[in-house]
Amino acid sequence: KLNQKYQIVWATGPKQFDIVKEELKKSSIDIEKVPNAKILPYIYNMEEIMNISDIIVARSGAMTITEISNLGKPSILIPLPNVSQDHQLRNAEVLQKIGAAQIILNNELEKDILNKEIIEIASNKAKMKEMGEKASTKSVKNVQEKIYAEIKKIVKGGK
């Protein structure tokens, strides 16, 4: 459904790439022939891909949440289950609570649910904009300058 209207870039991770492609073939989906869809083992220019994306569908590790916030993007987050202290769910909830993200739990993830969430957000430009603006409120501005200032203090013997 989505591939006709939206461009999809899917990074599986190197270990899962062949497995995912094989599972898609078993489901009669030849991803190589799907227009506007690209499946990759890894994305080396993630910030660039995220920057040109309208909606980000991703796991919710700390770096991903930071990138989403810094770029001011609406997102659908699928926390990785069984991680230390359930930190990915807690990360995702930070954006969900302010209306910047939707969460789909891994055990509830089905194509129809994901389709519905993507279409619901993408079909409402005002909602997309609002979610992006809310995400950017969690962005830490001037991080490099702040880190540099702290390092200078430490080097000079200050606290």
Predicted features along the sequence, with ranges:
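A donor-sugar binding/catalytic signature common to diverse glycosyltransferases
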Residues: 46-85
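Two-component system phosphotransfer/interaction surface
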Residues: 110-123, 152
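Donor-nucleotide binding loops and adjacent catalytic segments primarily
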Residues: 1-55, 89-93, 97, 104-113
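Hydrophobic alpha-helical packing elements
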Residues: 49, 110-114, 131, 143-147
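C-terminal alpha-helical cap of glycosyltransferases
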Residues: 141-159
